[in-house]
Swiss-Prot record:
It is a multi-pass membrane protein. Golgi membrane protein involved in vesicular trafficking. The chain crosses the membrane at residues 41-61, 62-82, 137-157, 161-181. Belongs to the TVP23 family. GO terms for cellular component: endoplasmic reticulum; Golgi apparatus; Golgi membrane. Keywords: Glycoprotein, Golgi apparatus, Membrane, Transmembrane, Transmembrane helix. This is Golgi apparatus membrane protein tvp23. InterPro entries: TVP23-like. It is found in: Golgi apparatus membrane.
Length: 219
């Protein structure tokens, strides 16, 4: 038979265990949510494979750089690995990622007189857009050059000018698509606005002429 003291101890222990179980359940649930955010991002993407490779090469280059600072003595090997990753990233983003994720594409051609000509292409603005693809593309496009700039500042502080040269190459390769797609996006918005204005003007003129015709000949 329980005494009053035993009952109180039992209740206190039960409450303590209940709180611990609840906290553990919350912790596990939070860990599961955090673990599922990245896969969920790819699940919500319209082009998960393109999104994966869009992030893979540029992230791999930064990871290789940071690990190489501590775990390798072969700077030339590291330079080749990072340069290869960023070169593949440059081609992939230019020809695949931008077209699939945000409906934009750019290229640069040389004219007859040797002049550099930028050509921007964009998908139909009425095409359904995926918010995950859009946000990830634009955030990553500006974030990664910024990360390389920070790594460059660290190299300057540590007087590692050989590493700084590698960072300069990385900034150059990652900034090409950043600058090109920024111009491509502005050009697309300008053309869409012009086409919309022309369409509205044409519609206004058509309505005006129709009303004038009806009023003149029909009354």
């Amino acid at each position: 038979m329980f005494t009053s003291l035993d009952r109180n101890l039992y209740v206190d222990n039960h409450i303590t265990l209940t709180k611990m179980d609840y906290q553990n359940t919350e912790t596990i649930a939070e860990q599961e949510r955090n673990a599922s955010r990245l896969p969920q991002m790819f699940q919500m993407s319209s082009h998960p494979v393109a999104l994966f490779f869009f992030l893979l090469f540029r992230t791999g280059a930064i990871v290789a750089y940071i690990l190489g600072m501590f775990f390798t003595s072969s700077f030339m090997l590291l330079f080749i690995v990072i340069f290869t990753l960023l070169a593949v990233d440059l081609w992939t983003v230019k020809n695949v990622s931008g077209r699939l994720l945000v409906g934009l594409r750019w290229r640069n051609e040389t004219g007859v007189d040797g002049e550099s000509i930028w050509i921007f292409e964009s998908a139909d603005p009425s095409r359904p857009r995926n918010a995950v693809d859009q946000k990830t593309f634009w955030y990553a496009l500006y974030l990664y050059p910024f990360i390389w700039i920070i790594l460059g500042i660290v190299a300057i502080i540590r007087f590692e000018f050989l590493w700084l040269a590698l960072v300069a190459v990385a900034i150059g390769l990652t900034s090409v698509n950043t600058a090109a797609y920024s111009r491509c996006d502005k050009d697309a918005k300008r053309r869409w606005a012009t086409e919309l204005a022309d369409s509205n003007s044409s519609g206004f003129v058509s309505r005006f002429l129709s009303r004038a015709f009806i009023k003149r000949f029909i009354g």
